[in-house]
């Protein structure tokens, strides 16, 4: 049975001294599993095909494969995320020793398509790092079986806040914001250069144009703020503004009311596509 507790033990087996980037990778994997587990539970069978788009350290893909799922991990390791490479090597070395097998694909999501192959495709905080996320989503949709599910979590830039750098955006122009926040951006220039300001309003328009069945999760932001109370490492990873907002909302006792925030004003956003 899949669980965050089991994933935690799996990660600590690979990285007994869980500090620094391994700790971040494990926390990211646990968050990803928490979002995709409800999708897995909607499938009647156990032996299904899974694609993780933007697998990063590959820890989550490796864990799912260790539990018997047929997993493909898509990760091109672009320059802004080259720090994942040593973590990948450690995960893959462990898998080789333990006989954990899954398929690895070094490809951009915009260039990868395997029609009708996967029961579940998920991508967690990756779309905003793609040059053409809508094309990537189309490829993912075409790669789904019928029935099949596609889960995507990413920031919603209809809300003028950039979480990777913790800055409030002025308008939609990257060049304008690059000038306004030159000093802040300099420290994470590779991440900034690779960002695409994907927006709920544009994503919804695109899905309607393509006549794709979808639903945005109104509970996403509420769930995230509730998780901040339970997971101190997750809390520490958040931008200062998010931590500050959490303290205010918690002291006012209104975190549950985040469910009623209009979808266009929720960030991050969670999209579930059904085929």
Language-model features, listed with the residues they occupy:
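Helix-to-beta-strand junctions that scaffold the AdoMet/dcAdoMet cofactor pocket
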Residues: 130-131, 144-146
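Short, solvent-exposed loop/turn segments at secondary-structure junctions
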Residues: 57-60, 77-79, 127, 157-159, ...
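A short beta-strand submotif of the Rossmann-like class I SAM-dependent methyltransferase core
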Residues: 120-126
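S-adenosyl-L-methionine-dependent methyltransferase catalytic module, highlighting the catalytic core
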Residues: 88, 134-139, 149-274
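A structural alpha-helix within SAM-dependent methyltransferase catalytic domains
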Residues: 62-65, 137-141
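Conserved N-terminal segment of class I S-adenosyl-L-methionine
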Residues: 1-116, 120, 264-273
């Amino acid at each position: 049975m899949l669980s965050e507790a089991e994933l935690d033990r799996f990660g600590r087996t690979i990285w007994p001294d869980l500090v620094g980037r391994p700790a971040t990778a494990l926390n990211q994997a646990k968050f990803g599993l928490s979002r995709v587990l409800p999708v897995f539970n909607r499938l009647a069978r156990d032996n299904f095909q899974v694609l993780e788009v933007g697998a990063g350290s590959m820890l989550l893909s490796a864990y799912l494969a260790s539990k018997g799922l047929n997993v493909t991990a898509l990760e091109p390791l672009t320059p802004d995320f080259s720090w994942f490479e040593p973590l990948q090597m450690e995960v893959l070395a462990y898998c080789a020793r333990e006989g954990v097998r899954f398929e690895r694909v070094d490809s951009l999501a915009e260039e990868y398509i395997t029609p009708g192959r996967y029961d579940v495709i998920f991508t967690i905080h990756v779309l905003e790092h793609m040059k053409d996320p809508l094309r990537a989503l189309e490829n993912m949709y075409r790669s789904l079986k019928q029935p099949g599910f596609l889960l995507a979590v990413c920031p919603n830039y209809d809300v003028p806040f950039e979480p990777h750098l913790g800055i409030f955006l002025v308008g939609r122009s990257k060049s304008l914001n690059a000038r306004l926040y030159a000093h802040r951006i300099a420290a994470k220039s590779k991440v900034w250069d690779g960002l695409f300001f994907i927006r709920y309003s544009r994503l919804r328009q695109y899905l309607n144009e393509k006549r794709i069945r979808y639903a945005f999760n109104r509970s996403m932001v509420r769930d995230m703020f509730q998780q901040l109370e339970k997971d101190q490492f997750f809390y520490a990873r958040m931008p200062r503004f998010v931590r500050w907002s959490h303290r205010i909302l918690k002291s006012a006792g209104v975190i549950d009311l985040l469910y009623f925030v209009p979808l266009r004003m929720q960030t991050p956003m969670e999209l579930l596509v059904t085929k």
